[in-house]
Amino acid sequence: MRKKGLLLFVLIVMLSLVALPSAGGAAPGFDDKEIRVAQWGPQTGPAAPWGSVARGSSILFNLVNEAGGIHGRKIKYFIRDDQYNPTQTKAAVKELVERQGIFAFVGGVSAAGGLAVKDYLAQNKVIWVGPATSVKEYVFPVNPYLFSIYPLYEDEASLLTKYIVEKLKIKKIGFFYQSDSYGKSGLDGFRQRMNHYKLKPVAEIPVEPTEKDLASQMLKFKNSGAESVIMWVNPTTAVIALKTCATIGYKPQWVSSNTLSDYALMHKISGGLWEGVITGAFSEPTDATLPLMVKYREAAKRMAPDERWGLFYMAGILFAEPFVDALKRAGPKLSTEACLKALNETKDFKGVGPKVNWSSAQHQGTDSVMIWKCGPNGTSIMLQSWTANDLATWKKK
C-alpha cells in the first residue's frame, strides 16, 4: 500500500512539472495549429484612450486567420489590461508567458511598463515587436528580442521643436511633461534642439500621470510668457491642461507627440479645444485612400462595428504588421530563432507607417515622422511630410 501511495505521489509530481512552464524556460508559444501572441494595454485608468491600440491589432490577426493563417498556423491573440501601471504590466506579462506560453508580444502602451518587463521577456526568449512607445533604453544597447518601430521620442521632440522655431518663428517655448521615462525622453529631444539653437526654454514643468488639478502648472506657463507649449503627457492630462488654460485665458500654440494624434478622439473629449493643436505623426491618415488603409478600414468596419476607427485603433495594426511579415518569411519550420532571423533581415518594410529597417546590429526601425495639425471637427491637416532628425546621434554610432 505504501509503495502504491509513493508511486502515485511521484506520478502527480511528474505530471505537474510537465504541465506548468517555468519562468526560466517558457513554452515555445506555438504548435502545428496556432501561434500565441499577446499585448498589454490600458483598457481602464488615466490612459484608457490608448487602450484601443491593443484592440486594433486584432484586426490584422483576424485577417491573417481568415486567409488560412501563416503556413497553416492561426494566430491566437491575448489582451491584458494593465491600467497604465508598471506593476500590473509585470503581473500580466508573467501570467501570459508562464501560463499561456506566449511566442511573441506586439505593441504595448507605456514606456514605464515596457521598461519593467523588457529584461524578463529577453530572459525568457520571448520576442517583442513594435512597442507602442519608444525610449532609447529599449534598443540601446541592442536587445536581441526587442524590435522597435516607433520613432524615438527624442527624435520626434527635436523635430517638433525645429518646426516651432523655424516654421512658426516662435522662440519662447515651454515643455510640459509626464514625470516618467515617456515624458523625460521627449524633454531630452526638446533640450537637444533648443541647445542647437542656443535658446533657453521659458519653462519645463513635470506632471504625474494621475494629477487632476493643473491650475498651478498652467499659470506658470502663462506667467513665463511661453508662446508655444510642447506637451508629452497622456490624453486625459492633455485635455485637463487645455480646459484649464481656457478658463484662465491662456492660448499658446500647443504641440504634442504623435501619441496624441488621434484627432477625432482628442477633439471629442476636449470639447473642440484640440482644433489647432500640432502633433507628430508616423502613419498615413486613417481616412487615406491607400489600398492597404482601405483594406484595414473596411475590415474593422466588418469585424468590429462597435469600435471607433481612429488613429490609436489603427496603430495597433501598424505595430503588428512587421511581425506578421517576419512570420511569413520565417517559413513553415517556425522557431524563435527563425523568426528572429527574419526580423533582423527586415529591409524597407512599408505598411501603413514609415519604412522599417532592422539588422542584428540595429533594432531602432526608423527616426522619421510627419507633422500634422488638427483641423475643424478633428480632421487632419498635413504640415510636413516624412522627415528624419538631422540631430539624431544614434545613427552615427
Question: Where do the protein language model's features map onto the residues?
Answer:
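Short glycine/serine- and small hydrophobic-enriched flexible loop segments
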Residues: 62, 243, 321-329
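Extracytoplasmic ligand/sensor domains, especially the bilobed periplasmic-binding protein
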Residues: 87, 99-205, 253-278, 285
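Short, low-complexity disordered leader/linker segments with a strong preference
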Residues: 1-36, 389-397
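Segments of small-molecule ligand-sensing domains
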Residues: 302-313, 324-382
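Immediate post-signal peptide segment of exported/extracytoplasmic ligand-binding proteins
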Residues: 24-39, 66-74, 165-171, 333
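Beta-alpha junction/loop-to-helix N-cap segments that form part of ligand/metal-binding clefts
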Residues: 34, 49-56, 67-140, 207-212, ...
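Extracytoplasmic "Venus flytrap"
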Residues: 27-31, 38-58, 80-87, 109-110, ...
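Extracellular/periplasmic periplasmic-binding protein-like sensory domains
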Residues: 242-317, 374, 387-394
